[in-house]
Swiss-Prot record:
One of its GO terms (molecular function) is efflux transmembrane transporter activity. The chain crosses the membrane at residues 68-88, 110-130, 131-151, 164-184, 194-214, 229-246, 260-280, 287-307, 337-357, 384-404, 412-432. It comes from the Bacteria. Keywords: Cell membrane, Membrane, Transmembrane, Transmembrane helix, Transport. The keyword Metal-binding does not apply. This is Uncharacterized MFS-type transporter Rv0037c. One of its GO terms (biological process) is response to antibiotic. InterPro entries: MFS, MFS_trans_sf. Its main location: membrane. The keyword Metal-binding does not apply.
Length: 441
């Protein structure tokens, strides 16, 4: 056999073995395997809850929403926790993270029961949004705790790969949860009663996540009591949560650069989300067609993110975090321009490609925080990331809602999104250059 053909055969066999090797690596890390199971169950519940809530608020014949109402709903859901998240992060860096996961999931169960009851009795939007606000805040708390705990159950040289595995598994689970919502909605209707049943179903995966969180031993998930740990009372640690988290980000250019790129991406996601929701709300069968089209767009974005989870570890090993994130931001700016025609099929394709680019940026930021931040401060920094994640989203969606017409035809905002990506690229390039060389960069 010619040498070239032999090389191709060997190369193809290596690629065929890659998923098997990753699976063996996962199963060889028992605590990571348990953590992955908690993530999968938790994010299935997240996807089901968020899709059910979106259907109840935006595609519900018993309720109606204009652009500002949509933006207001997102703000009430995410902004308060985003501002308080870094304070909660202080607790993740002081308390056994196993008990943080247990406590947060217990609180989620109580809130799920409350939100389901509010929908069942047909109460107004305010109590519904307040209940959903707290439930979603606890879900984000769980997500931050899982990310902060990962370096404790994975060897340093495998952090990037296993983080991609964890995020990919969680994304698939959330996608399945969101789409599972369509079954009870189809069976029970698109009104408040059907939405209530969907929310009550969320208790099943959250209960599983709660029980699986109990399998970890004391302090297996951290935090470590290193020399950089914040001592003093828990009240002091909570009150200074924002300060310690923000200061750590500023002191580490690799982390600051990653978060700047992530913030730019989330701003564009906010604009695109509002545009697609407004466009599909004018589909004739609003309760079915409009929601189905919106789910198709978000599913395409999620599929792109899943693909990024597969590609990013290889890209980082070949080009490093800095160059990989820069390339993703540059590609995103170009892809965004292609959606300016506001044709829904084109927007779905662009959503897929932006899902790839945006998730690459996020994974680069995640690896910087997991590898460059002291464990005693990692919870603070992940909470800051979570805050930035949602503040950027809400800020852009609120500004856009004040200016975009109700029918959603505003191509200039798509082009503005491309400019935001370019701004994020510039900031990431300048700030990232100041970072000292570290392993995995």
């Amino acid at each position: 056999m010619p040498r070239v053909e032999v090389g191709l055969v060997i190369h193809s066999r290596m690629h065929a073995r890659a998923p098997v090797d990753v699976w063996r690596s996962v199963r060889s890390l028992p605590d990571f395997w348990r953590l992955l199971q908690v993530r999968v169950a938790s994010q299935f519940g997240d996807g089901l809850f968020q899709a059910g809530l979106a259907g109840a608020l935006l595609f519900n014949p018993d309720r109606a929403a204009d652009p500002m109402a949509i933006a207001g709903a997102f703000a009430v859901l995410f902004l308060p926790y985003s501002l308080l998240g870094p304070f909660a992060g202080a607790l993740m860096d002081r308390w056994d993270r196993r008990w943080v996961l247990v406590g947060a999931n217990t609180g989620r169960l109580a809130l799920i029961a409350g939100v389901g009851t509010i929908l069942a009795v047909g109460a107004g939007d305010v109590p519904l949004l307040v209940g959903a606000l707290v439930a979603n805040g606890l879900a984000r708390f769980v997500a931050s705790g899982l990310s902060a705990a990962l370096p404790h159950v994975v060897p340093r040289e495998q952090v990037v790969t296993m983080n991609s595995v964890a995020i990919a598994s969680g994304a698939v689970s959330a996608f399945l949860g969101a789409n599972f919502m369509l079954l009870p909605r189809w069976l029970l209707g698109s009104g408040d009663e059907g939405a209530s049943a969907i929310v009550f179903l969320v208790a099943i995966p959250v209960s599983i996540a709660l029980l699986w969180s109990l399998r970890f031993g004391p302090r297996v998930l951290g935090p470590d009591d290193t020399e950089r740990a914040i001592h003093g009372s828990a009240v002091y640690a909570v009150v200074t949560g924002w300060l310690h988290g923000a200061r750590t980000v500023v002191q580490l250019p690799t982390v600051a650069a990653g978060l700047s790129g992530l913030a730019a991406h989330r701003m564009v996601v906010g604009i695109n989300s509002l545009l697609i929701l407004l466009l599909v709300r004018h589909v004739t069968a609003r309760a079915v067609g409009g929601l189905g089209t919106a789910l198709l767009f978000f599913a395409a974005t999620g599929l792109g993110a899943f693909l990024a989870n597969v590609l990013t570890p290889t890209a980082i090993r070949r080009w490093g975090r800095y160059a990989t994130a820069n390339g993703a931001l540059a590609a995103a700016a170009t892809i965004q321009v292609a959606a300016a025609g506001l044709l829904v099929p084109v927007m779905v394709v662009c959503g897929f490609l932006l899902g790839v680019a945006g998730q690459v940026v996020k994974l680069c930021a995640d690896s910087a925080m997991q590898m460059d931040v002291d464990d005693a401060l990692r919870g603070h920094v992940f909470a800051v990331q979570d805050a930035l994640f949602w503040v950027s989203y809400i800020l852009s969606i609120t500004v856009a809602a004040a200016l975009i017409p109700e029918h959603g035809h505003a191509p200039v905002f798509v082009l503005f999104g491309s400019a935001i990506y370019l701004a994020g690229l510039v900031v990431h390039t300048i700030v990232g250059r100041r970072g000292q060389p570290v392993i995995g960069r």
